[in-house]
Amino acid sequence: MKIALFGGSFDPPHNGHNSVVLEALEKLDIDKLIIMPTYINPFKKSFSADEKQRFLWVKKLWGHLPKVEICDFEIRQKRPVPSIESVKYLYKLYNPSKFYLLIGADHLEKLHLWHDFEKLNSLVEFVIANRNDIGIPKNFKDLKTNKKIASSFIRDTLNTNEVCEEIKDEVKKYYEKLQKN
């Protein structure tokens, strides 16, 4: 079995994330794409949307797609989970012959700082979602995406133009409510 893991905060999920999901399904030779929202990203202190809400948005957007599985492993841990731990969990579950780990190009600069990076690098092939034409090292796969949007922009401005139609109204109401509190 060939699998790919796309983890993230998804706070909120947006068209950039959607582009990564659709490109991965189209361009990678995989049997399963596992989308795994984080409980708390090891590199962030907090989220705006709680883990249950982010999981529901992700499930609503991509849970119906063929080959896609929405996984709550990291959320169930109720703590920051390093990627290596999620990868080992999925290895035990699926024993894949090929394992792709999808990450944004913005993570490249600090990738070597990730927990147990050497072991992680030996277990997966990194696929870089490249939205800014950043030079991707030759030992990584380049997954071109055409969306240049950040979740923080959506949260800060309440501009939901780049939020997927299926959840646009929910996202706007959710963050408006947070801003009022």
UniProtKB/Swiss-Prot annotation:
It comes from the Bacteria. Transmembrane segments: none annotated. Its EC number is 2.7.7.18. One of its GO terms (molecular function) is ATP binding. It holds the Pfam family CTP_transf_like. Pathway: Cofactor biosynthesis; NAD(+) biosynthesis; deamido-NAD(+) from nicotinate D-ribonucleotide: step 1/1. Catalyzes the reversible adenylation of nicotinate mononucleotide (NaMN) to nicotinic acid adenine dinucleotide (NaAD). Belongs to the NadD family. This is Probable nicotinate-nucleotide adenylyltransferase. It comes from Campylobacter jejuni subsp. jejuni serotype O:23/36 (strain 81-176).
